[in-house]
Every structure is written in C-alpha cells, then in structure tokens.
Amino acid sequence: MKRLRCVLAYDGTDFSGFQVQPDQVTVQGEIEAALNRVTGEDIQVFGSGRTDAGVHARGQVIHFDTASNIPMDKWRFVLNNQLPDSIVIRTVEEVDASFHARFDVQVKEYRYCIDNNPVADVFRHRYADHVRFPLDVDAMQQAAHYLVGEHDFTSFCSAKTYVEDKVRTVYGLSVEKIGDEVWVTCRGNGFLYNMVRIIVGTLVEVGQGKRNPAELREILAACDREKAGKTAPAKGLTMWEVVY
C-alpha cells in the first residue's frame, strides 16, 4: 500500500462542489470513480479543502492510498484519460504515509477575478464576476489592509457556518487591477465557509463607493454577518495554491 499526492485543476462550473454528495456530480466523486476504473479498488480521496459549487481550482491537492502497481510516471496519464475534460491531474507523487492533504496544510491561496468592463466578456463569464462600473482599486486595497492578521472572522462567514472557532489568520490580502480585470488575492492558514467570497463582496462595495475603507475594521469587530457585504458569486473564485 502506498500513499499518493496529486495536484489538480478543475472548472467547477458544472460540479456541485468538491465533496461527494448523494445524487450529485462532484469533483471528488469523479476522481474516486476514475480510480475505481483504473485500479479496481474502492479508494477514498482526501482533499486539502472543500470548494463550493461553481468554485474552480488551479492547485487543489488530494491524497489517496492504493495497492496498485501502476508505474509512477503513468499515473497522471492513466487518470486524466478517465476524467472529464473539466478535471485535470497536474502532478502525481508518492509521499510518506503520514502525509494528509487537509491536516498538513500551512497556507492556502485563493484568487478572485472581476471582469470590470462596461460590457461583460462572454469568454470570461465562467471564471469572473462582471462588475460594469469602474472600481476604486486603491480604496479596496486600503480596506483590505484591515483584514490582514489574526482575527475573528464571524462577520465574514456564512450564517450556516457551524464551526465554533472562527479565528483565522490572513497572511496577505491584495487587490490589483490587471488590464480590465480586478484580482483579489487572499492567503491564509484556512478559511471559513464563504469567507473569501464575502470579503470580496464587501471590498467590491468599497470599490463602488458604497462603503468607506475604514468600515472594514468596524465590520470585523462587530462579529455580525449582517454588517458585511454580499457574498460574491462562486464563479470568480479559484483555489490557486496550497502550501505544505
């Protein structure tokens, strides 16, 4: 028996998230089905995190155990041949049996793309949220500064979050305009349910002039979901990188 670690990318548009759910098409479900076809084993896959329906990944990490004798240099090709075009295994490597894709994570990075054109780009609509009026990126970056560090992010997580400890550490939160796109990059030790999307939704309201940047400090201190902005659409969010 050996433990393998894979880095994968996927277009989350047509999936009901990463985690297996009854009667739903999920990323985990597709991978486990592919593994069963190539090994004949019932293999459980463990991911670094559970992306929601519609959220994409460029650097999702998984691990699984297998007794298969498939050569290491063939694994990527064998699996990709069994997966839909919307899921790609980027790398496969053997790791120590103690490695865990979820519990060993040190840093996660998510990026959110906003199409800031007056008219939406049809070729980007699966991967970016469209905001037609120009955003004040400088104001958004000022606001983002208040969220960096260790804080209770109750105001920035879904009311459906049942985790008691809502303290997380954000190592970096940047807002950058690249051409006609605005990118929000968030790095942290972990994120609550909808946390990044609520942060982005609130920053967009700052960029639209609906909020003052300093309000972010007050919203954070309030520990009240109703004080923050809307939850940004899932399609603009990508799990970019996971660091161990």
Curated annotation (Swiss-Prot):
Belongs to the tRNA pseudouridine synthase TruA family. InterPro entries: PsdUridine_synth_cat_dom_sf (IPR020103), PsdUridine_synth_TruA (IPR001406), PsdUridine_synth_TruA_a/b_dom (IPR020097), PsdUridine_synth_TruA_C (IPR020095), TruA/RsuA/RluB/E/F_N (IPR020094). GO terms for biological process: tRNA pseudouridine synthesis. It comes from Brevibacillus brevis (strain 47 / JCM 6285 / NBRC 100599). Formation of pseudouridine at positions 38, 39 and 40 in the anticodon stem and loop of transfer RNAs. It holds the Pfam family PseudoU_synth_1. The lineage of its organism: Bacteria, Bacillati, Bacillota, Bacilli, Bacillales. GO terms for molecular function: RNA binding; tRNA pseudouridine(38-40) synthase activity. Keywords: Isomerase, tRNA processing. Its EC number is 5.4.99.12. It is an enzyme of class 5 (isomerase). It catalyses: uridine(38/39/40) in tRNA = pseudouridine(38/39/40) in tRNA. Homodimer. CDD domains: PseudoU_synth_EcTruA (cd02570). Substrate binds at residue 110. The active site is at residue 52. This is tRNA pseudouridine synthase A.
